[in-house]
């Protein structure tokens, strides 16, 4: 019988907004309703190596997973005008 038989390995429980045992933040519900610029600022404060992409809410997005990419989806609130 090996010394590992019958042993139970315990791993840290994942925290909210993390993947696996990582403590890296993966979502920012607190920025909902903020301007894209303010949301990007907060995301970069939490995850400085993030590539933050500001895109329209109905835009097509990349299907490949990139752990450093964060999408900030925005909607135009008023009609853009010249002047």
From Swiss-Prot:
Write out the similarity annotation: Belongs to the protease inhibitor I13 (potato type I serine protease inhibitor) family.
Disordered: annotated span: 1-24
Known InterPro entries for this protein?
Prot_inh_pot1 (IPR000864), Prot_inh_pot1_sf (IPR036354)
Q: What does this protein do?
A: Inhibits both subtilisin and chymotrypsin.
> What GO molecular function annotations does the UniProt record carry, in alphabetical order?
serine-type endopeptidase inhibitor activity
Pfam name, any one: potato_inhibit
Q: Which keywords does the record carry?
A: Protease inhibitor, Serine protease inhibitor
Q: What is this protein called?
A: Subtilisin-chymotrypsin inhibitor CI-1A
Species assigned in the record? Hordeum vulgare (Barley)
Q: Which GO terms describe its biological process?
A: response to wounding
The highest taxon in the source lineage is Eukaryota
């Amino acid at each position: 019988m090996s010394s590992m038989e019958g042993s139970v390995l315990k791993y840290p429980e994942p925290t909210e907004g993390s993947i696996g045992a990582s403590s890296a933040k993966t979502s920012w519900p607190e920025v909902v309703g903020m301007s894209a610029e303010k949301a990007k600022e907060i995301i970069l404060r939490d995850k400085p190596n993030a590539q933050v992409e500001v895109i329209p809410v109905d835009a097509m997005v990349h299907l490949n997973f990139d752990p450093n990419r964060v999408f900030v989806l925005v909607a135009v609130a008023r009609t853009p005008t010249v002047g």
